[in-house]
């Protein structure tokens, strides 16, 4: 039962990616990207639906050629979530997906081409009310900036971004967001800090090519956590060499840890020791798997003994403290005792019951205005 986040978010202009607000007072949006062959429409739609089920707000889809652009148009008709088209090298692909109803265009200023090509993309976006993401990446900086700085640096990333922000300003186009990604945490964090002081547009956060599930999660949590704690960031994407659904889960876990978004269960669990009165690790693994479908924000404490158990349980919607027998707390008050037999089954029932009650109470509160 933790309160609102104490973080004061950076002021930014609000834009819309489809029906999802980004920036301003909007919640921080969680984004992911498909890793299917875009030309395989059925596989891509199926993966997008899995991402939607996991709670994704925005999905990016790679569009490497014109065949993929046509497939993108078919995909767009079959999903409800806003889609961002990831465009590199060929500006004509951006023009085509704009015709096909894309919700946002992601272009890389290091490879999209001459100024007249950027103008053509901007005109197409303006005519259709499509926002743009300027996506600067340490691995694809413009050649003159590589020569000037010798290697990717925070200053180089920001100079690249500002160069293209100024270009869009000259074209009187303000409906855009910006990212300055690097695989190095310190480089990315410093680049975002510098950029946040110089523009009003929303910032899309990410540590690019962060790694596999474990290492990428840690690297992203450290980098994005630093920025989000400073109020920087309007959308996030956790780049993992893993199932994209894991990106969404990790994204929400990072936001939940900072009290910036609430979705599903926030588990508080001890690492266990010889004082535990039930198998904490086994109990946690089973509960996490069984309760993935719950979307109601709920704090659940699973503590193996009475050292910290009562204190944590009293701060949770549902809390389990190990003992002989174990004691369950509901809304901070002792509720009932449970033996280890069927412990997970009984605890799951209590959590689902509490989730249903909270959902009903939240709905009534919203209805009252």
From Swiss-Prot:
Cofactor stoichiometry and binding remark: Binds 1 [4Fe-4S] cluster.
Transmembrane annotation, as ranges: none
The organism's place on the tree of life at top rank: Bacteria
Pathway assigned in UniProt: Isoprenoid biosynthesis; isopentenyl diphosphate biosynthesis via DXP pathway; isopentenyl diphosphate from 1-deoxy-D-xylulose 5-phosphate: step 5/6
Residues noted as binding [4Fe-4S] cluster in the record, renumbered to the chain: 270, 273, 305, 312
Any Pfam family: GcpE
GO molecular function annotations of the record: 4 iron, 4 sulfur cluster binding; 4-hydroxy-3-methylbut-2-en-1-yl diphosphate synthase activity (ferredoxin); 4-hydroxy-3-methylbut-2-enyl-diphosphate synthase activity (flavodoxin); iron ion binding
Signal peptide limits: none
One BP term from GO: terpenoid biosynthetic process
InterPro entries, per the entry: Dihydropteroate_synth-like_sf, IspG_bac, IspG_bac-typ, NO2/SO3_Rdtase_4Fe4S_sf
Catalytic EC class: oxidoreductase
UniProt entry keywords in alphabetical sequence: 4Fe-4S, Iron, Iron-sulfur, Isoprene biosynthesis, Metal-binding, Oxidoreductase
Similarity remark: Belongs to the IspG family.
Function: Converts 2C-methyl-D-erythritol 2,4-cyclodiphosphate (ME-2,4cPP) into 1-hydroxy-2-methyl-2-(E)-butenyl 4-diphosphate.
Entries under HAMAP family matching the protein: IspG
PANTHER family: 4-HYDROXY-3-METHYLBUT-2-EN-1-YL DIPHOSPHATE SYNTHASE (PTHR30454), 4-HYDROXY-3-METHYLBUT-2-EN-1-YL DIPHOSPHATE SYNTHASE (FERREDOXIN), CHLOROPLASTIC (PTHR30454:SF0)
Name this polypeptide is given: 4-hydroxy-3-methylbut-2-en-1-yl diphosphate synthase (flavodoxin)
Organism: Pseudomonas entomophila (strain L48)
């Amino acid at each position: 039962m933790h309160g609102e986040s104490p973080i004061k978010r950076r002021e930014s202009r609000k834009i819309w990616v489809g029906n999802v607000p980004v920036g301003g007072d909007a919640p921080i949006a969680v984004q992911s990207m498909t890793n299917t062959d875009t030309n395989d429409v059925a596989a891509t739609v199926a993966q997008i639906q899995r991402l939607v089920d996991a709670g994704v707000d925005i999905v990016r889809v790679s569009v490497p050629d014109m065949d993929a652009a046509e497939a993108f148009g078919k995909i767009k008709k079959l999903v409800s979530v806003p889609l961002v088209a990831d465009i590199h090298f060929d500006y004509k692909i951006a023009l085509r997906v704009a015709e096909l109803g894309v919700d946002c265009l992601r272009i890389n200023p290091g490879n999209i081409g001459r100024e007249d090509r950027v103008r053509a993309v901007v005109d197409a976006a303006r005519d259709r009310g499509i926002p743009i993401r300027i996506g600067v990446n340490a691995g694809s900086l413009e050649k003159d900036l590589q020569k000037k700085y010798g290697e990717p640096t925070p200053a180089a990333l920001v100079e690249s971004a500002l160069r293209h922000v100024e270009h869009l300003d000259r074209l009187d186009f303000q409906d855009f967001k910006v990212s300055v990604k690097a695989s190095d945490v310190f480089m990315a964090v410093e680049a975002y800090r510098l950029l946040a002081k110089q523009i009003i547009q929303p910032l899309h956060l990410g540590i690019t090519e962060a790694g596999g599930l474990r290492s990428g999660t840690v690297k992203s949590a450290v980098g994005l956590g630093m920025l989000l704690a400073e109020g920087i960031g309007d959308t996030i994407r956790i780049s993992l060499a893993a199932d994209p659904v894991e990106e969404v889960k990790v994204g929400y876990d990072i936001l939940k840890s900072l009290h910036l978004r609430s979705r599903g269960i926030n588990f508080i669990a001890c690492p266990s020791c010889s004082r535990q009165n039930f198998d904490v690790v086994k109990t946690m693994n089973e509960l996490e798997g069984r309760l993935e479908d719950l979307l109601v924000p709920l704090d659940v404490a699973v503590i193996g003994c009475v050292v910290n158990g009562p204190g944590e349980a009293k701060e949770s919607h549902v809390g389990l403290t190990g003992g002989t027998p174990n004691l369950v707390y509901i809304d901070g008050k002792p509720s009932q005792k449970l033996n280890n037999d069927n412990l997970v089954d009984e605890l799951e029932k209590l959590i689902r019951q509490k989730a249903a009650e909270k959902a009903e109470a939240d709905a009534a509160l919203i209805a009252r205005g």
